Amino acid sequence: LGFPSADLGPSLDAVCDRLGVNTDHNRPSKRDQLLELGLERLGWHVAAMPRNVVGCEQGVRCGSCGYGCPLGAKRSTMRTWLEDAAAAGARIVVGAKARRVLVRNGAAAGVDAGPVQVRSRAVVVAAGAIETPALLLRSGLRNPNIGRWLRLHPGTGVFGSFDEKVRPWEGTLQARYSDQFRYLDGGYGVKYETVPAHPALLTAALPWEGAASHARLMASLPHLSLIAVIPRDRGSGRVRTGRDGEPVVTYRLADEDARRLRVGVDGAARILAAAGAHEIFTSHARLQRWADGFPDDAYRFGPARGSLYSFHLMGSARMGGSPDLGAVDPAGESWEVRNLVVADGSAFPTASGVNPMITIEAIAHLNAGRLAGRLT
């Protein structure tokens, strides 16, 4: 990252404290019970997932957590940092899209957001790994790293059908995980988690062999469990801007990432088999059933071959020790424009090996303090 890990430690602690990260709200859903059962029977790694929730009921309603916590128990950005900002006097403007950063004498001087014009001594960009590089490019920045090195954690899912009802849309969002294959190829392996499988998610992920087959699979939804296979990708994509200035994304799964994903898919199938699934299949366009191993050529990733999901986006305006290596310096500041700081996942120099939420917020916390020090 370009700074000592000891510098980041206090910010990691501050973020975890503000978000209320704990392992006291980890009652496993039926999905997670099956994940844990399969892992334990195989003798593989399994652990409780730390979660940023306070007062979570860990019951039926928690399955909709990804759509917004109905109880307000999830300590999201809205319930933490935005509340803190508002209490400190910040004005929060919604419905206004930043079109470009205003620059004067080589330094950030504000933001053009169409009907809203902001004048400031510094600008912090935190628009995500797609919109951040697009904003920088629209603002006239030309560092060659802007838009490059986009990582996605391009994952997939493996399904298991059980005799008992799983009701996979219910229960704690994610209570268990496994790092059994996390350290493949120097830390570029996969993680296993479960996710609440609502009908809309399943419709996008299930294989298609025709209307009758699809109807049968959807009717079996109460008996299905899904294991998400989330890799750390070495390959990368790119964000450019079109004629209208909007982002255009290209990404091709690297062969080495596809190979590791295959290992992860086989492992997920073994977990489901050990947990007692009587049918196991992938999210490929052609239904691929697992019977002690998929056919060697059955699980190749290519155009129209299977469903992949971009779990976490990062890296498209990465930090580096010089303009040749990164779009911004280790403090997140642009090499081209003073007091223009990137504070989101696009600043990651490589893909993270875990969910990047805490790391994103910790780097933003650290670099916000550095920026404040320069401005005072």
Predicted regions and their residues:
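A glycine-rich dinucleotide-binding beta-alpha-beta segment and adjacent secondary-structure elements
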Residues: G55, R61-Y67, R99-L102, L272, ...
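Glycine- and acidic
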Residues: R18-N22, P50, G63-G68, E246-D255, ...
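FAD cofactor-binding and catalytic pocket of flavoenzymes
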Residues: L1, N143-D266, R270, G302, ...
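Conserved redox-cofactor binding core of oxidoreductases
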Residues: L1-A98, I280-S307
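Non-transmembrane alpha-helical segments in soluble domains
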Residues: G9-C16, E36, L82, A86, ...
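A conserved FAD-binding loop/helix module that cradles the flavin
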Residues: T350-L371
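Glycine-rich loop(s) and the adjacent beta-strand/alpha-helix scaffold that form part
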Residues: P4, A87, A96, V101, ...
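Short, hydrophobic/aromatic-rich segments at coil-to-beta transitions
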Residues: G106-V111
